[in-house]
Regions:
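Basic amphipathic alpha-helical segments that dock to polyanions
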Residues: 60, 64-67
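C-terminal regulatory/oligomerization modules of transcriptional regulators
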Residues: 1-14, 69, 74, 91-130
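N-terminal helix-turn-helix DNA-binding core of bacterial DNA-binding proteins
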Residues: 12-59, 79, 86, 94
Length: 130
């Protein structure tokens, strides 16, 4: 039976999962680390690179552009010589930081347990799946 309300709504299977788009923002390797480091205020590119261990210049550039495009941070260029570019969380970026802070805290608290579980798993004689 078709109702007027059901005709105006697309079928659930056809709806794109918009939550997945948000998870793409926060689920990559570097985005949350950038957001965490900007939570105390604006930073320049070199300050961010120094603060995030292991990130390449290219990956930091890609991550910053992506977060800027998504409205998580702003990029400000000051017309001085040499040009001064800084990055700062937007109000939406600040709420993302608040929402993800517990995840980063959980990660820090459980990293040793994760390492131990991985070592136990890797030490098993046969870890192949059927």
């Amino acid at each position: 039976m078709t109702t007027p309300d059901s005709e105006s709504r697309p079928a659930r299977q056809q709806e794109p999962c918009r939550t997945r788009e948000v998870l793409d923002i926060v689920g990559d390797k570097w985005s949350l680390l950038v957001v965490r480091n900007l939570s105390q205020g604006p930073l320049r590119f070199t300050e961010l690179k120094r603060a995030i261990d292991g990130i390449s210049q290219r990956m930091l550039t890609v991550t910053l552009r992506s977060l800027e495009r998504d409205g998580i941070l702003t990029r400000t260029v000051r017309n001085v010589m040499p040009p001064h570019v800084s990055y700062e969380l937007t109000p939406m970026g600040k709420t993302l930081r608040q929402a993800t802070a517990p995840l980063l805290e959980w990660s820090t608290a459980h990293l040793a347990h994760i390492d131990a579980a991985r070592a136990t798993y890797d030490a098993r004689p046969d870890t192949s799946l059927p």
